[in-house]
Amino acid sequence: MSSSKGDEEINSNNEEMLGIDKLSVDYDYLLYKINDYVNSIQIQTKEVCQRQNELISQNVVEDIVDVNIQSFKDILSKCEELENYFTMLDQIEMISDTFHGRIDDVLKEYRKLNGN
């Protein structure tokens, strides 16, 4: 048993002389830093992508809404013009309905003035 205990001490001394313990710690620390760095990049990338998605969604939606609102305003304006034309037609109808009566009245007055 003493030889295996002595072998462990020699191996331990050899590992310390070669810096294997320090190398192992440095390796673990490097893996930790790489993992931390990757996580940091992941978080930043996710935040940037979310912001871009929100901006794109908002702008696209806002642009679509703005275009739709303008289209509805144009349609409403055309409907109002059409309503004005129908109002004009109603006025023409009223004028034409009373036109014959007014012409008859004018003719009667003319005949009275001329003595016929």
Swiss-Prot record:
Component of the biogenesis of lysosome-related organelles complex-1 (BLOC-1). One of its GO terms (cellular component) is BLOC-1 complex. The keyword DNA damage does not apply. It is found in: Cytoplasm. Keywords: Coiled coil, Cytoplasm, Transport. Belongs to the BLOC1S4 family. Residues 63-95 form a coiled coil. The lineage of its organism: Eukaryota, Fungi, Dikarya, Ascomycota, Saccharomycotina. The gene is CLN1. Component of the biogenesis of lysosome-related organelles complex-1 (BLOC-1), a complex that is involved in endosomal cargo sorting. This is Biogenesis of lysosome-related organelles complex 1 subunit CNL1. PANTHER family: BIOGENESIS OF LYSOSOME-RELATED ORGANELLES COMPLEX 1 SUBUNIT CNL1. It comes from the Eukaryota. InterPro entries: CNL1 (IPR034455). One of its GO terms (biological process) is endosome organization. The keyword NADP does not apply.
